Amino acid sequence: LLASKLHNQGYVFENRRFKLFTFSRILEKGIKHSKSELLFKRSISFYFSSAIDDIVCDLGEGCFKGMEFNLSGQKVFVSRIEVLTLPAFEEKILIRMLAPLTIYSTFEDGNGNKKTHYYAPGEINFSELLEKNAIKKFSTIQADLNYDNLQLSVKPIKVSPERNLQVVRFKNTTIQGWTGIYELFGSRELITVTYEA
């Protein structure tokens, strides 16, 4: 029930939908089998994280109830789930992005066509848009708390287009995101929600 709500609806704040979870790419390196397929020798693993405890619990319970599921036409068996302790966040931390960080804005060009601009780390508005996104996510989770004094900035520490620019196609849309190492500075609440979701 929770999984279908997340997939179909998400959590809503100011008419914007948020999934409030994230997951890494598969950590093991696969062997390229075709243009769209990778082969993995044995097991695969990945990280899953959410700012909502019920989402994590629902995923864990679902995996144990159905230890087998379908992934791109292949049967996959769950052998182990490990719960990791959340780090103790300070107001300045270094973080390695295991899932690409995607920052974008949508606008209309002179002909009325919808355009999307994906921002690169260090580009103007990158840090500001990340902060706005984190505030909206935090407000979705903690609607009763005041977020006027919360702030967050991001600084790329070890990021290069050759190694860290990730481009994927999803539902006929090209999406750009960035992995790499970043410094997050600001309110612990926003650092936490950025880390978890």
Language-model segments: residues:
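RNA-interacting cores
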Residues: 1-197
